[in-house]
Amino acid sequence: MRLAAIILVGGASARMGADKALLCWNGRRAVDRLADLARTVGAEHILTVGHGDHGLPRLDDPSPDGGPVAGIAAGVAALKAKGYGRVLVLAVDAPTVRPEDLSPLIATVPPGAAYEGLNLPLVMDIDASPSDAGPGWAVRRLVERAGLARLACPAGATERLRGANTPEERHRLLTALLQAETAA
């Protein structure tokens, strides 16, 4: 089954005070780090959903105030039309996620999975996406209605997977990223 990735780049970034997609993380924009990550784990196509042109294939969020599921639903419809069968959904506020953090999700059997206590990232078979999913839905509801498994989060990965919504959270993640990439 062909895998594509959606990177959610919407949201007002009010708590962060800057567009999270454009923030630099050790010299690279968040959106670029995530696009490379998605390719590394096998995504054949990357689609950003939200606002702004980030130099990648994009889809404007048809309901910018409708929450992440509105963007996921729009992206899933676009990817289904292109013949993709499975989607990895990433949030732009989590650019320090590592390939090994995603491996358990990628390896799941249909219809896909998300981690316990986190709604993103997730992997979902496109045909499992509820046809009525859209604005106002919580991601948790999408996960439940799609029948996605809940997996234990890999040890030490929770903070990376949760991402950064404030400058303080970004500072903690950036410090850890710099230490990890310097040691590598």
Predicted regions span which residues?
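Conserved alpha/beta core of the MobA/IspD/sugar-nucleotide pyrophosphorylase nucleotidyltransferase superfamily
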Residues: 136-184
